[in-house]
């Protein structure tokens, strides 16, 4: 049985979250609880297309260990909620990347890692897509050629912050 709030004092610990003094009861919105769960259990799909993939693998290695942030790399798009586009995307590869993205369940997020994935990099040619945002809705850009593993970790932390600010995104958007 919950203690009545008449004899207990509500203490606001952050905006929209209160605790009942003297108990283990937290009062908050459903958005905050769902976003907390999502942001602390990201499952990225690694889609390495060039040299940035080496740095992405280094970010998952023991030195930085993204697992401590609840990030578990997945090999199947049906199990992932984040896709990390790491490297140069050609026009021939773009439909395949889009198909893999479409196979991911909602809500899904995109991280563009490296100068090539962000802007096309040094390859301003007829065969290179000038940024992953030309065919996917990119949420976080991680610049660099190639970016350090710490930069990818910073990008993932920025994505976690973005997820915590979402409202009402619980399932498939219509």
Swiss-Prot record:
The keyword Cell membrane applies. Binds 1 [4Fe-4S] cluster. Its cofactor is [4Fe-4S] cluster. It comes from the Bacteria. [4Fe-4S] cluster binds at residues 51-52, 116, 145. Its EC number is 7.1.1.-. Keywords: 4Fe-4S, Cell inner membrane, Cell membrane, Iron, Iron-sulfur, Membrane, Metal-binding, NAD, Quinone, Translocase, Transport, Ubiquinone. Its main location: membrane. It holds the Pfam family Oxidored_q6. It is a peripheral membrane protein. One of its GO terms (biological process) is electron transport coupled proton transport. One of its GO terms (molecular function) is NADH:ubiquinone reductase (non-electrogenic) activity. GO terms for cellular component: plasma membrane; respiratory chain complex I. The keyword Iron-sulfur applies. It is found in: Cell inner membrane. Belongs to the complex I 20 kDa subunit family. HAMAP family: NDH1_NuoB. NDH-1 shuttles electrons from NADH, via FMN and iron-sulfur (Fe-S) centers, to quinones in the respiratory chain. The immediate electron acceptor for the enzyme in this species is believed to be ubiquinone. Couples the redox reaction to proton translocation (for every two electrons transferred, four hydrogen ions are translocated across the cytoplasmic membrane), and thus conserves the redox energy in a proton gradient. NDH-1 is composed of 14 different subunits. Subunits NuoB, C, D, E, F, and G constitute the peripheral sector of the complex. This is NADH-quinone oxidoreductase subunit B 2. It comes from Thermodesulfovibrio yellowstonii (strain ATCC 51303 / DSM 11347 / YP87). The lineage of its organism: Bacteria, Pseudomonadati, Nitrospirota, Thermodesulfovibrionia, Thermodesulfovibrionales. The gene is nuoB2.
